[in-house]
Amino acid sequence: MLEIKYVRENIEEVKQALAKRAGKADFEGFARAEKKRRELLQQIEELRHQRNTVSDEIARMKRNKEDAGTSILEMRTVSDEIKTLDKTLAEQDDFIQQFMMAIPNMPHPDVPMGASDADNTLEKKVGTPRSFDFPIKAHWDIGEDLGILDFPRAAKITGARFSLYLGSGAKLERALINFMLDLHTNEHGYTETLPPFIVNRESLLGTGQLPKFEEDLFKIEGQEYYLIPTSEVPMTNIYRDEVLNEENLPIKFTAYTPCFRSEAGSYGKDTRGLIRQHQFNKVELVKYTTPETSYQELESLLANAETVLKRLGLPYQVVTLCSGDLGFSATRTYDIEVWMPGQDKYREISSCSNCEAFQARRANIKFRRAGQKKLEFVHTLNGSGLAVGRTVAAILENFQQPDGSVVIPEVLRPYMGGKETITNETR
């Protein structure tokens, strides 16, 4: 959430920033509510002053044993008027709060302007895509031919956009999870967490999925609980409504969790394979930082995610998202896109974002500098380190062999009992 004082004083700048995101908001309604709120506050203040004056007059009359009935009636009338105005004020405050919760973060000044992913800026390419001298297959065909992925039976068990891993497929997924967690905890200094996979409404409000994106979530019927769309949500809410000490920052968390997304609006997109699933595994990275170090920490977060791909030997590129492609809570985002030869394109495998104080303001996460009484909002950052299913897909496509087998990246072999190649396991 943006600071309301900033929005009040810079309304045109906020309008322009929202326009760069191709977003819409009821700024006229906000202005009316703000005007009405100021009028109500003035009226309430005047009535309270009147009530206090009458109260003092009643006390004086009682001391002098005078009849205070008329004054008492006047005070009750004034009190009733105050209650009515307080109710109207609460309605205006609620409208303003809902307006503020629906406004996305402001793009960083360095973010390129644009309307869609076609306007994103390429930062770098790492690794050279492999040349194949045999027909390339997509990962869904490779996995099914090897007997390690079974999409038809997953659909039978649940429905579309679910996957069933078998044998070495399941081991490869688990190996990647363990490798990523070991890398981020042992080398990158993150603290491993195992958070709940179900969160309450307040948690999703804090990170920005609610109220605007409820249709993208899986809600538990009859409860104010939701399945997590990413472990960014529980990890960012660990310190909700708390005050941290500057000396403990940055705080760096990582977690493996399944993630659940309804993929509303994705009909017809990536209907095959592991790219767009209702349930998928992800290793997530979250940081709490001071404002002055958050962009340095963003570069570090990006490097941490890149290291996974470098160790696996997968070619990738990094792009900066344009204003129209930014996520709701982010002010700047890097996407890492891995090369998928079976699809002849780069596909997103990680998003690394700085949300500055946007989430911290919504979740009320503050810190205190040494020797200072004033509290400040932390900056929060998050990034995938990495999306596990998409990494499996990239391994299958990049390391496929002419005989249909797949070479296991060397760094994963200790996690797979020394196995070097996945061969046909069809049952």
Swiss-Prot record:
<dbReference type="Pfam" id="PF00587">
    <property type="entry name" value="tRNA-synt_2b"/>
</dbReference>
<dbReference type="Pfam" id="PF02403">
    <property type="entry name" value="Seryl_tRNA_N"/>
</dbReference>
<dbReference type="InterPro" id="IPR042103">
    <property type="entry name" value="SerRS_1_N_sf"/>
</dbReference>
<keyword id="KW-0963">Cytoplasm</keyword>
<dbReference type="GO" id="GO:0005524">
    <property type="term" value="F:ATP binding"/>
</dbReference>
<dbReference type="GO" id="GO:0006434">
    <property type="term" value="P:seryl-tRNA aminoacylation"/>
</dbReference>
<feature type="binding site">
    <location>
        <begin position="230"/>
        <end position="232"/>
    </location>
    <ligand>
        <name>L-serine</name>
    </ligand>
</feature>
<dbReference type="GO" id="GO:0005737">
    <property type="term" value="C:cytoplasm"/>
</dbReference>
<keyword id="KW-0648">Protein biosynthesis</keyword>
<feature type="binding site">
    <location>
        <begin position="348"/>
        <end position="351"/>
    </location>
    <ligand>
        <name>ATP</name>
    </ligand>
</feature>
<dbReference type="InterPro" id="IPR015866">
    <property type="entry name" value="Ser-tRNA-synth_1_N"/>
</dbReference>
<comment type="pathway">
    <text>Aminoacyl-tRNA biosynthesis; selenocysteinyl-tRNA(Sec) biosynthesis; L-seryl-tRNA(Sec) from L-serine and tRNA(Sec): step 1/1.</text>
</comment>
<dbReference type="InterPro" id="IPR033729">
    <property type="entry name" value="SerRS_core"/>
</dbReference>
<dbReference type="InterPro" id="IPR002317">
    <property type="entry name" value="Ser-tRNA-ligase_type_1"/>
</dbReference>
<protein>
    <recommendedName>
        <fullName>Serine--tRNA ligase</fullName>
        <ecNumber>6.1.1.11</ecNumber>
    </recommendedName>
</protein>
<comment type="function">
    <text>Catalyzes the attachment of serine to tRNA(Ser). Is also able to aminoacylate tRNA(Sec) with serine, to form the misacylated tRNA L-seryl-tRNA(Sec), which will be further converted into selenocysteinyl-tRNA(Sec).</text>
</comment>
<keyword id="KW-0547">Nucleotide-binding</keyword>
<dbReference type="InterPro" id="IPR010978">
    <property type="entry name" value="tRNA-bd_arm"/>
</dbReference>
<feature type="binding site">
    <location>
        <position position="284"/>
    </location>
    <ligand>
        <name>L-serine</name>
    </ligand>
</feature>
<comment type="subunit">
    <text>Homodimer. The tRNA molecule binds across the dimer.</text>
</comment>
<dbReference type="InterPro" id="IPR006195">
    <property type="entry name" value="aa-tRNA-synth_II"/>
</dbReference>
<dbReference type="GO" id="GO:0016260">
    <property type="term" value="P:selenocysteine biosynthetic process"/>
</dbReference>
<comment type="similarity">
    <text>Belongs to the class-II aminoacyl-tRNA synthetase family. Type-1 seryl-tRNA synthetase subfamily.</text>
</comment>
<keyword id="KW-0030">Aminoacyl-tRNA synthetase</keyword>
<dbReference type="InterPro" id="IPR045864">
    <property type="entry name" value="aa-tRNA-synth_II/BPL/LPL"/>
</dbReference>
<keyword id="KW-0067">ATP-binding</keyword>
<feature type="binding site">
    <location>
        <begin position="261"/>
        <end position="263"/>
    </location>
    <ligand>
        <name>ATP</name>
    </ligand>
</feature>
<keyword id="KW-0436">Ligase</keyword>
<dbReference type="InterPro" id="IPR002314">
    <property type="entry name" value="aa-tRNA-synt_IIb"/>
</dbReference>
<dbReference type="GO" id="GO:0004828">
    <property type="term" value="F:serine-tRNA ligase activity"/>
</dbReference>
<feature type="binding site">
    <location>
        <position position="384"/>
    </location>
    <ligand>
        <name>L-serine</name>
    </ligand>
</feature>
